[in-house]
Regions:
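Short, Lys/Arg-enriched N-terminal segments with co-localized hydrophobic residues
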Residues: 1-8
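ATP-dependent carboxylate activation and anion-phosphoryl transfer catalytic cores
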Residues: 9, 14-15, 21-24, 240-241, ...
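Redox-cofactor binding/interface segments in oxidoreductases and associated redox assembly factors
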Residues: 13, 95-96, 170, 209
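Short glycine-rich anion-binding loops that position phosphate/pyrophosphate groups of nucleotides
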Residues: 17, 98-101, 173-175, 298
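Conserved N-proximal alpha/beta basic substrate-recognition cap immediately N-terminal to
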Residues: 19-21, 25-38, 43-151
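Phosphate-binding site of ATP-dependent enzymes
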Residues: 27-28, 155-156, 163-167, 177-265, ...
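Anion (oxyanion) recognition and catalysis
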Residues: 36, 117, 162-163, 274
């Protein structure tokens, strides 16, 4: 991809602790590496280190020197300067990469980011977009692309849905990495206890979807960057006997070209996501069905970059450079 020559920028990454990164597969690491190679200055903070002082949104942020990992388990890939209190408007771009769960604390972070945006900061993805797009519920806007789905707090509704379809998946609305996802069949003796646990006795909203048999071939992560679709999807193939393809639970990632159906889905979603201030989204597709729209911290860059001659991180940093603010 062409590198856009740009004046060096100050880029703040709001991300989990850097020493916890698995550098051989971490997407935020790939973003930082690309930005550092272009001469941008990197800073890091945690979502919990955002605050409001004298009306300004500030972060306790450390400037990061990117050294690069020598091997897969090298945690000394960066050097962090002592943290200092910096207003978010002092950065050309702020990249929000904190992992879900999207709990109240996460919600407050996005509200502070929205306040910073009102003060002139450029945040990717925007705080508003992250609030608007619950990763599970967002698919309900696109029924033409989804499997039969219900959202409910009532176990009786789920039982009725199960009786209709015979084989379903149930999942919480705030999970990540495959947590809390169950497959239920009518013959399952544990239906009652699974629903009680998951729905906390009719007090927690969940989603149920008809089981999609194509999951045995994995689900696909399709990346959309600033309205442009990355031409390769990352198929996540479940381990034998496992319902979930998530890489976090041992799925295997295989990069592959997009199918015709993938293109049909992305043609509809890409311009809408861009219009909503979503610079980076990860669509999850199983077979022909859209199952999730990830906007909080989509991954998959490195697997695609290693398997195909396509630099996803360069495409992403190009998009950040195009959309950043002059400070």
């Amino acid at each position: 991809l062409p590198r856009h020559p740009k004046a060096p920028m100050n880029i703040l990454f709001i991300a989990d602790p850097l020493a916890s990164f698995k550098t051989y597969k971490d997407t935020t690491y790939a973003m930082m590496r690309e930005a550092a190679q272009r001469g941008h200055t990197l800073f890091h903070t945690l979502a919990a280190q955002l605050s409001v002082q004298n009306g300004s949104v500030v972060a306790q942020a450390s400037q990061i020197q990117f050294l690069g990992a020598k091997d897969d388990h090298d945690h000394a890939w960066f050097q962090a300067a002592p943290a200092q209190s910096l207003a978010l408007t002092q950065f050309n771009a702020i990249i929000m990469r904190s992992d879900p769960p999207f709990n109240m604390q996460y919600l407050y972070s996005t509200q502070l980011l929205t306040l910073a945006e009102q003060q002139g900061a450029r945040v990717f993805n925007s705080g508003q977009a992250m609030r608007d797009y619950n990763e599970k519920l967002a698919i309900l806007n696109y029924p033409q692309f989804t499997a039969p789905t219900i959202v409910t707090t009532r176990a009786a509704d789920v039982r009725q849905f199960l009786a209709k379809h015979g084989d379903i998946i149930v999942k919480p609305l705030d999970g990540m990495g495959g947590m809390g996802i169950f497959r239920l069949r009518e013959s399952d003796p544990n239906i009652g206890s699974i629903l009680e646990t998951l729905m906390q006795l009719d007090s927690r909203t969940i989603m149920a979807q008809r089981y999609i048999p194509a999951i045995v071939h994995g689900d696909k992560r399709i990346l959309i960057i600033d309205g442009e679709v990355v031409p390769y999807a990352l198929a996540r193939i479940p381990q034998n006997g496992e319902t979930r393809g998530n890489l976090a639970v041992g799925g295997r990632g295989v990069a592959q070209a997009l199918s015709e159906r993938d293109r049909e889905i992305t043609q509809t979603l890409a311009p809408q996501l861009k219009a909503r201030g979503i610079l980076l989204a990860g669509l999850d597709v199983i077979g022909d069905c859209l199952t999730e729209i990830n906007v909080t911290s989509p991954t998959g860059f490195q697997e695609i970059m290693k398997q195909k001659d396509f630099d996803v991180a360069a495409q992403f940093v190009n998009a950040v450079e195009r959309n950043a603010q002059a400070v």
